[in-house]
Swiss-Prot record:
Residues 27-50 have a biased composition (Low complexity). This is Protein phosphatase 1J. The gene is PPM1J. InterPro entries: PP2C, PPM-type-like_dom_sf, PPM-type_phosphatase-like_dom. Its EC number is 3.1.3.16. Belongs to the PP2C family. It comes from Homo sapiens (Human). Interacts with UBE2I/UBC9.
């Protein structure tokens, strides 16, 4: 049997079947993502081999290409098979012998307990160099690496309905961010307020001075102050939108199935930017204090936004859904009765007379992890999902899903950080079974067992967090020490020391 499998795999390789084309990089003509001294980006861990010789070459190649793990894990083919084992659920981390991640970042992940065929989480950790695109003064110049900026980048992407969107975002989102920052290189390095407009040709008057424009001067007596920080936030928001648009364009040609939640951290010029679209979360643990750096975006947390859209555009609901929320599904026998409800403007509840339209399925239903939009999806922000439709219907769900992240900023220069101060990023596989306080307790317990200058301490912490959420196999399932069910989802965790590269790298 083994020989037949080997023969089949050899036949597939020799048949010359090519994997689907890779999505285009937004960074043409220059696609490098690191300074000249940095090593070029390596290919991702090799895809898993096909397990059957009966599949056609095209299908087998597609199956192999559909599973990959982050490059920095440096997995061998055998390690890749162990990472894909639902029974053992071995925790994966970068090898001790390999090059450390930037900032001595810790990382660990584990596959789900059978929820999906492969691990649909993806991760990325990069040092990205940004070349300026133009001079703010309007004088064209050639890009110079000496005048650029570097930013540190971490990303967790929790895929659903397939891993294609998460894999694509993990390879390209940081490049979209870099592209958006190119116009800001000189502006961010200049302490003066940002110009209102960027000149397009030499000699164009500075648009921050409106004296060259016609009209009453009184209308220019006041101008909003825009901070450098808000420019970076806007660049990140635009990058998320452009990434989502690229997925829409290329989803068929590149097998970008499903969608993904995206949690991204950027360190630039002394500040940490945390951008979240989905139900992954990030917290800072600083001297025992817990500082939330993101929040979940679910049908419950965004109920009013969803209901408002359904109210303003009822055609998106068809004749199947109502934008109103009721404590439970309305029954036909309750027509004419007064029942509790709430609409897009309400945080409380009131009574209304039940009408025929109220018998439709509610746009937002369920609660907690069972809350759904249009009875289909449990997250309301993320990337992808352009082909997602209501079951047995042609109604698209994408209009209700936002690709824009919420961005929170943390100024590292405002505090004196010790080696035990960390930023913890985790997909929902961690947070579904672990509270913020439990994470903080694990941070204290694990880091206290290591010397402050031991670079492996943050990887050990990431592993402990993943193991704590996964549990141990017992009673036909994965159980926590309190005998509650462990997380059966994919779990991915970054631990970023807030001391930065100068102290710990």
């Amino acid at each position: 049997m083994l020989n037949r499998v080997r023969s089949a795999v050899a036949h597939l390789v020799s048949s010359g079947g090519a994997p689907p084309p890779r999505p285009k990089s937004p960074d043409l003509p220059n696609a490098a993502s690191a300074p000249p001294a940095a090593a070029p980006e390596a290919p991702r861990s090799p895809p898993a081999k096909a397990g059957s010789g009966s599949a056609t070459p095209a299908k087998a190649v597609e199956a192999r290409a559909s599973f990959s793990r982050p490059t920095f894990l440096q997995l061998s083919p055998g390690g890749l098979r162990r990472a894909d084992d639902h029974a053992g659920r071995a925790v994966q981390s970068p090898p001790d012998t390999g090059r450390r991640l930037p900032w001595s970042t810790g990382y660990a992940e584990v596959i789900n307990a059978g929820k999906s065929r492969h691990n649909e989480d993806q991760a990325c950790c990069e040092v990205v160099y940004v070349e300026g695109r133009r001079s703010v003064t309007g004088v064209p110049r050639e890009p110079s690496r000496g005048q650029g900026l570097c930013f540190y980048y971490w990303g967790l992407f929790d895929g659903h309905a397939g891993g294609g969107a998460a894999e694509m975002a993990s390879r390209l989102l940081h490049r979209h961010i870099r592209e958006q920052l190119k116009d800001l290189v000189e502006i961010l390095q200049d302490p003066s307020p940002p110009p209102l407009c960027l000149p397009t040709t030499p000699g164009t008057p500075d648009s921050s001075d409106p004296s060259h424009l016609l009209g009453p001067q009184s209308c220019w007596s006041s101008q909003k102050e825009v901070s450098h920080e808000s420019l970076v936030v806007g660049a990140v928001e635009n990058a998320f939108q452009l990434m989502d648009e690229q997925m829409a364009r290329e989803r068929r040609g590149h097998q970008v199935e499903g969608g993904c939640c995206a949690l991204v951290v950027i360190y630039l010029l002394g500040k940490v930017y945390v951008a979240n679209a989905g139900d992954s979360r990030a917290i800072i643990v600083r001297n025992g204090e817990i500082i939330p750096m993101s929040r979940e975006f679910t049908p419950e947390t965004e109920r009013q936004r969803l209901q408002l859209l359904g109210f303003l555009k009822p055609e998106l609901l068809g004749s199947e859904f109502t934008h109103l929320e009721f404590p439970r599904r309305v029954l036909p026998k309750e027509l004419g009765q007064r029942m509790l409800y709430r609409d897009q403007n309400m945080t409380g509840w009131a009574y209304k007379k039940i009408e025929l339209e109220d018998l439709r399925f509610p746009l937002v239903c369920g609660e907690g992890k069972k809350a759904r939009v249009m009875a289909t999806i449990g997250v309301t922000r993320g990337l992808g999902d352009h082909s997602l439709k209501v079951c047995s219907s042609t109604l698209p769900i994408k209009p209700f899903l936002s690709c824009f992240p919420e961005v929170r900023v943390y100024d590292l220069t405002q505090y004196e950080h010790c080696p035990d101060d960390v930023l913890v990023l985790g997909t929902d596989g961690l947070w579904d079974v672990t509270t913020d306080c439990e994470v903080a307790a694990t941070v204290d317990r694990v880091l206290s067992a290591y010397e402050p200058n031991d670079h492996s301490r943050y990887t050990a912490l990431a592993q402990a967090l993943v193991l704590g959420a996964r549990g141990t196999p017992r009673d036909r399932g994965w159980r926590l020490p309190n005998n509650k069910l462990g997380s059966g989802d994919d779990i991915s965790v970054f631990v970023i020391p807030l001391g930065g590269p100068g102290s710990y790298s």
